[in-house]
Amino acid sequence: MIYQSPTIQVELLEDNIAKLCFNAQGSVNKFDRETIASLDAALDSIKQNTNIKALLLTSAKSTFIVGADITEFLTLFQQDDATLLAWVEQANAVFNKLEDLPFPTASAINGFALGGGCETILATDLRVADTNARIGLPETKLGLIPGFGGTVRLPRVIGADNALEWITTAKDQRPEDALKVGAIDAVVAPENLEAAAIQMLHDALNGSLDWQARRTKKQSPLQLPKLEAMMSFATAKGMVFSVAGKHYPAPMAAVNVVEQAAGLDRDGALKVEALAFIKLAKTDVAQALIGIFLNDQFVKGKAKKAGKLAKDVNQAAVLGAGIMGGGIAYQSASKGTPIVMKDIAQPALELGLNEAAKILTTQVARGRSTPEKMAKVLNNITPSLDYAAIKNSDIVVEAVVEHPKVKATVLAEVEGYVSEDAIIASNTSTISINLLAKSLKKPERFCGMHFFNPVHKMPLVEIIRGEHSSEETIATVVAYASKMGKTPIVVNDCPGFFVNRVLFPYFAGFSGLLAEGADFAAVDKVMEKQFGWPMGPAYLLDVVGLDTGHHAQAVMAEGFPDRMGKNGKDAIDIMFENKRLGQKNTKGFYAYSVDRRGKPKKDIDPTSYELLSAEFGELKAFESDDIIARCMIPMIIETVRCLEEGIIASPAEGDMGLVYGIGFPPFRGGVFRYLDTMGVANFVALADKYAHLGGLYQVTDAMRALAANNGSYYQA
C-alpha cells in the first residue's frame, strides 16, 4: 500500500501502474476538505515513489464522486474573500498536482462524476466511463460556477460551445453524449471498466496514445480563432439571458469567465475562475439555491426515515378518475406500483386513462420513453366501475369532487371494501381531515394526501396528519409518495393545510390592490419580472380556476375570519359571478385562445377591466415596491404563523413546500430564507408600515421578539 487514509487508498498494480481509489466512509464519495487534503497527501506519496509509471483513478462506491460536500458551503462562504480565495487556490493546487504528474493518468468513471468529480477526471489525461456513468458540472444550479478548474479544462477538452452548454444548463450527460464531444475516450460495460482504463494507460506508455499532447492542450490558451470566439460567446450570452434572466447570474458569469480566460494559460485562467467563483459564492442567490439543495436533502432524509415505519405498498387504488385521478394513476404506475382507477362513470375512466396515455405519448415523442415502457405503465393501471376491484389495495387515495358530503360518503363506502389494515387517504386541497375522519370507523388509518396539478409535473405532495392519524399511517403515505417520485412534507390539519393557507393571503393582498384601483396586468408584471414568480396572481388564479379560487377563499374566510374574512366583493368574487373561470372556459382576468402548439395563450380582455372598474372605479398606478409589499407581506406572515402553530415542523419544510408547491422564486430560497436574507427586523419594520390594512399585515409577537434579538429562522 502506497498511501491509505479514511477516504483514499493507493496501491501498486502490475506493470508499475498505481491505483488511487476513492473510498469515503459514507455511502458516496464527496469532495469535502478532508478528501481534498487526502488527495493532496496521496499525490505526494505517488510523486515520491519512483517505481510508478502511470496512475489510475477509481472509486470503490457505486458512483465515482458526486461532487463537493455542499453542507460545508454555507459556513465556508461566510468567511472573508481572502480566506475563501486561499481555499479555492489550495484545492486547485491539488488538481494541478494531479494534472502535472510526470506520467500518464486515467480515470475509470462509474456512476456519477459531477461537479468536483467531473473536475477530477478532467485533470487526468485519459477518461473511460461505464455505461451507467453520468458526467456534468451542475454548479450553476446552486448559483455558482465550477471552482476547481471546470471552466478552464472543459472548454479546452470539448470546445467552447459544448463546454458552455454543459456548464450553463448544468445537466448530467450520458456517457454516449460525453464520448461524442470528446469529454471521455471510451464507454465500456461496468465489468470491463478497470481493464479498459489500464489498457489505455498501456497504450499511453507504449506511445500509441499521445497523452502529453492532450495535457498540453489543457494547460494552454483556448484554441479558438478571434472571429469564431466573438460569435460563440455572443450567441451563448444571448441564449443564457433568454433562459436564466437577470435573477440567476451564475450561467452568465460562466460564459464571461470562459471568454475572459480564453487567451490565458491554465494558471492564469484558474485565477479568473477563482475570483468569479468567490464573487458568486457571496451572493444571496447562491445562499438561497444552496439552501434549497440542503432543504431538499433534509426533507428527503425525513421521508427515508419514515420509510422504516412504513408498511409495504404493493397495490394502490385511486377513487375518482378524470384528469386528477388519471394523473395520480399515471404517477403510481410509472414508478412501479400497480393501481386500480375506480369511478362511477365510464366516461370519467376513459378521461383518466387518456390523461395517463397523453403524458406517456408526449414522453415517447420526446425520446424520454419507449412504446414498450408506455405499454407497461398503462398495463399497471386497471380501470373499474366496481368497488370489488379495490379489495386488495394497500392504500386507497380518494380523489373525488371537492365537496365534504360527497367525500365523506365515498370514504365510508371504501372502508367496507378494503382490508382492516389498508390505508385510506384523501386528496383534498381544503377540506378538514379531522372532519372527513368522522365518516370512518378507523380514523387512525386515514390522512390527507394533497397532490398538486398537474400531478406528473408538480414535485410536492402535502401529507396531512389528522388528530387520529397513526404514525404508521403517516409513514406509509410518506413512503408511497416518495416511491411515486414526489417530495412529501407532513403538515398538521388546519383550513387550507399549509400551501393553500399561505397562498390565499397573497391573493387577498392582490385583491386589496385591485379594490384600490390597481391594474391586475401591472401587478402580474411586477410580481413576475421583479419578484420572480413564474405567474403573477391574476394569471395564477386563471390557471387554478376562479371557481376553485372562490371556493377555497370561502373556506379560508370561514377558518380565519379575523384575518381572511371579507367586507364586500373582491376581484375573485366579480370574476366568479360573471362566470369568468379562467383558462378552463377561456376567460378570467385574461382572455385565452390556443396557440399553434395547442397551448393556452393569454391576452388582455377589456371586459375584465370594465367589470372591475364598475365596482372599484378608475385605475390607479402603484409603485413596484408597494405592489410587492402588499402581495408578499400577508403570505410571509401567514407562513411564519404556520411554523409557530406547528402546522409545519421546520423552516426547511416550509420553504420546500412553497418552492415545490406554488413556484416561490427559487433564487429567493423560500419565505424563511427570504426573511433571513432581508433581516427579520427589516421585515417587521416594513410590515408595520402596512399594519393599518388589517390582520394579514400584522406580525406576530414571536416575530417581533426574534427581530429585537437580531435572530434568524435558519441557524448558521
Curated annotation (Swiss-Prot):
Matching PROSITE patterns: 3HCDH
Record-listed NAD(+) binding positions: 324, 343, 400-402, 407, 429, 453
Catalytic activity line of the entry: a (3S)-3-hydroxyacyl-CoA + NAD(+) = a 3-oxoacyl-CoA + NADH + H(+); a (3S)-3-hydroxyacyl-CoA = a (2E)-enoyl-CoA + H2O; a 4-saturated-(3S)-3-hydroxyacyl-CoA = a (3E)-enoyl-CoA + H2O; (3S)-3-hydroxybutanoyl-CoA = (3R)-3-hydroxybutanoyl-CoA
Function of the molecule: Involved in the aerobic and anaerobic degradation of long-chain fatty acids via beta-oxidation cycle. Catalyzes the formation of 3-oxoacyl-CoA from enoyl-CoA via L-3-hydroxyacyl-CoA. It can also use D-3-hydroxyacyl-CoA and cis-3-enoyl-CoA as substrate.
Positions annotated to bind substrate: 296, 500, 660
Active site: 450
Cross-referenced Gene3D superfamilies: 1.10.1040.50, 2-enoyl-CoA Hydratase, Chain A, domain 1 (3.90.226.10), NAD(P)-binding Rossmann-like Domain (3.40.50.720)
Pathway assignment: Lipid metabolism; fatty acid beta-oxidation
InterPro entries: 3-OHacyl-CoA_DH_CS, 3-OHacyl-CoA_DH_NAD-bd, 3HC_DH_C, 6-PGluconate_DH-like_C_sf, ClpP/crotonase-like_dom_sf, Enoyl-CoA_hydra/iso, FA_oxidation_alpha_subunit, FadB
Subunit record text: Heterotetramer of two alpha chains (FadB) and two beta chains (FadA).
Gene Ontology biological process terms, A to Z: fatty acid beta-oxidation
EC id: 4.2.1.17, 5.1.2.3, 5.3.3.8, 1.1.1.35
Similarity comment: In the N-terminal section; belongs to the enoyl-CoA hydratase/isomerase family. In the C-terminal section; belongs to the 3-hydroxyacyl-CoA dehydrogenase family.
Region of interest called Enoyl-CoA hydratase/isomerase, as start-end residue ranges on this chain: 1-189
Name of the protein in its database record: Fatty acid oxidation complex subunit alpha
Annotated site location: Important for catalytic activity: 119, 139
Record region (3-hydroxyacyl-CoA dehydrogenase): 311-716
Keyword terms of this UniProt record: Fatty acid metabolism, Isomerase, Lipid degradation, Lipid metabolism, Lyase, Multifunctional enzyme, NAD, Oxidoreductase
Gene Ontology CC: one annotated term: fatty acid beta-oxidation multienzyme complex
Source species, domain of life: Bacteria
MF terms in GO: 3-hydroxybutyryl-CoA epimerase activity; delta(3)-delta(2)-enoyl-CoA isomerase activity; enoyl-CoA hydratase activity; long-chain-3-hydroxyacyl-CoA dehydrogenase activity; NAD+ binding
